[in-house]
């Protein structure tokens, strides 16, 4: 997992509440267990005018130009602004995979579904909870936003908005540590235990 560093980006304002994981990545695209390749089908039913299926050439599909992700001014955005209860519905980890593969590094919302919120951290995405007043400020601005995880701040128009984050999760993101890399920190201890265990119980 890549280290999470301070960055500046435009934000995509997706002003909808209760966006569920089936809207984020529809069920027909869940056959793969790879973490890459899902970005092209992020919000598939909203981005395209036809019905998408796995294996389709998305470059030939008709785009819904009214949908915010398809508008040219929001291309290459790394921040997503949404309303309350983002990521509700089924617990599919493909949802953060799709968001990450599209290029999002941070999602800002008044609230998140618990499982989705936890899955974001496991996949290197920073989910930020902000109150409605701050969300209104962010939605109303077209300026770029700076996310400083180390300082726990959102900066826009020379205004800083602090945010809360668990210190352990913050450390993991800053250092690019996922569950596998955390486990590998103890690889020597694991190998020593295995050697001792199988020497002692050599009939296993």
Curated annotation (Swiss-Prot):
Pfam families: Aconitase_C. Its EC number is 4.2.1.33. GO terms for molecular function: 3-isopropylmalate dehydratase activity. GO terms for biological process: L-leucine biosynthetic process. It is an enzyme of class 4 (lyase). Pathway: Amino-acid biosynthesis; L-leucine biosynthesis; L-leucine from 3-methyl-2-oxobutanoate: step 2/4. Coiled coil: none annotated. SUPFAM superfamilies: LeuD/IlvD-like (SSF52016). GO terms for cellular component: 3-isopropylmalate dehydratase complex. It catalyses: (2R,3S)-3-isopropylmalate = (2S)-2-isopropylmalate. Keywords: Amino-acid biosynthesis, Branched-chain amino acid biosynthesis, Leucine biosynthesis, Lyase. CDD domains: IPMI_Swivel (cd01577). NCBIfam families: leuD, PRK01641.1. Catalyzes the isomerization between 2-isopropylmalate and 3-isopropylmalate, via the formation of 2-isopropylmaleate. Belongs to the LeuD family. LeuD type 1 subfamily. Heterodimer of LeuC and LeuD. This is 3-isopropylmalate dehydratase small subunit. It comes from Vesicomyosocius okutanii subsp. Calyptogena okutanii (strain HA). The lineage of its organism: Bacteria, Pseudomonadati, Pseudomonadota, Gammaproteobacteria, Candidatus Pseudothioglobaceae.
């Amino acid at each position: 997992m890549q280290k999470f560093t301070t960055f500046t980006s435009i934000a995509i304002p997706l002003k909808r509440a209760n966006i569920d994981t089936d809207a984020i990545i529809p069920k027909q695209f869940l056959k793969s267990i790879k973490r890459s390749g899902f970005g092209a089908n992020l919000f598939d039913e909203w981005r395209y005018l036809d019905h998408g299926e796995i294996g389709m050439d998305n470059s030939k599909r008709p785009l819904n130009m009214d949908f915010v992700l398809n508008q040219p001014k929001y291309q290459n955005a790394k921040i997503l602004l949404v309303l309350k209860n983002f990521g509700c519905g089924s617990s599919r980890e493909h949802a953060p995979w799709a968001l990450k593969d599209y290029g999002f590094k941070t999602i800002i919302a008044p609230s998140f579904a618990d499982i989705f919120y936890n899955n974001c951290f496991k996949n290197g995405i920073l989910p930020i909870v902000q109150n409605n007043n701050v969300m209104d400020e962010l939605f109303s601005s077209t300026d770029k936003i700076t996310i400083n995880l180390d300082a726990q701040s959102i900066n826009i128009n020379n205004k800083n908005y602090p945010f809360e984050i668990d210190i352990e999760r913050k450390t993991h993101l800053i250092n690019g540590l996922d569950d596998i890399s955390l486990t590998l920190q103890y690889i020597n201890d694991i190998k020593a235990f295995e050697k001792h265990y199988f020497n002692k119980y050599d009939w296993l």
